[in-house]
Amino acid sequence: MNFSYSSLSTWTTLMTLGCLLLHSSISSAQLTPTFYDNTCPSVFTIVRDTIVNELRSDPRIAASILRLHFHDCFVNGCDASILLDNTTSFRTEKDAAPNANSARGFPVIDRMKAAVETACPRTVSCADILTIAAQQAVNLAGGPSWRVPLGRRDSLQAFFALANTNLPAPFFTLPQLKASFQNVGLDRPSDLVALSGGHTFGKNQCQFIMDRLYNFSNTGLPDPTLNTTYLQTLRGQCPRNGNQTVLVDFDLRTPTVFDNKYYVNLKELKGLIQTDQELFSSPNATDTIPLVREYADGTQKFFNAFVEAMNRMGNITPLTGTQGQIRQNCRVVNSNSLLHDVVEIVDFVSSM
């Protein structure tokens, strides 16, 4: 391409003007449910239809998508960093202990992104697609419907070390669990109890409950807070020397439905993993037990609390305005970030 000094000067001027317009318009942008109303209203239908199609062959996918969103937001905020693959510059969060061989649903997000890019190129971030997908997944499983605040942008890197430290482990005590939530700004008891209700559907691997079943706290005995009948059921599914990747339902009552039965289970000492049952059985649970009882007694109370907590979680340090980028492929940072930013500026200015 031949580029004269005059054309370069014009291009530079336009770039400067575009950047000023963009900065003045969205540098202090706040998340809003109407963010894509004019630029990509079809994103919601695209995401929902993708999940509906996937559910036909994979009933677990709704719970898996919700978990992806949770694991994304707890690591440097909801920035789609969990979706990035390994590079020479950083290690993927997919390799971190809380995600390795358990986080799933990435190809489904890829299909959503490809369809959204066809409909609305360079417009919707991967972070927002994952956020919308989590909401739609919950609703399709029988849970509440709500309008999610949008306008996030995508991280330029992954945070492997942070994923290993920020994500709560299945064997956490209640004080440890509270600390992990407070660490990301979720300091209300209702944040912890309502978001834990995401375990009302989906599955978990035997390896994460073996200590509860056979050697709790190195006692050689099962967790004393575990219902004895439920203990025998779980031991049948997860024998001492069996395959520890076998999957067990989080909710023995309605395993694929998003409802309040998770809390009913906790009251009966039938929480699957330690962090679940801690909400009701820990000596430190004086502020969580009343919420477990409240949500067990009323589905709508749980739904209302869950929506509020999801929106609070979705607002953990989002990238907005000129921060980050809008990835074209959720697995990789845009190969030419400067050129892509110029295109974004031109697109934005032309839409004003």
Curated annotation (Swiss-Prot):
UniProt enzyme class: oxidoreductase
Question: What Pfam families does the entry give?
Answer: peroxidase (PF00141)
Active-site residue numbers: H71
Signal peptide stretch: 1-29
- Note accompanying the cofactor annotation: Binds 1 heme b (iron(II)-protoporphyrin IX) group per subunit. Binds 2 calcium ions per subunit.
Q: Which GO terms describe its biological process?
A: hydrogen peroxide catabolic process; response to oxidative stress; response to salt stress
Site (Transition state stabilizer): residue numbering on this chain:
R67
In which residues is substrate bound?
P168
Induction note:
Late induced by infection with an incompatible bacterial plant pathogen.
Binding residues annotated for Ca(2+) 2, in chain numbering: T200, D251, T254, D259
The note filed under miscellaneous reads: There are 73 peroxidase genes in A.thaliana.
Name by which UniProt lists this protein: Peroxidase 32
Q: Which organism is it from?
A: Arabidopsis thaliana
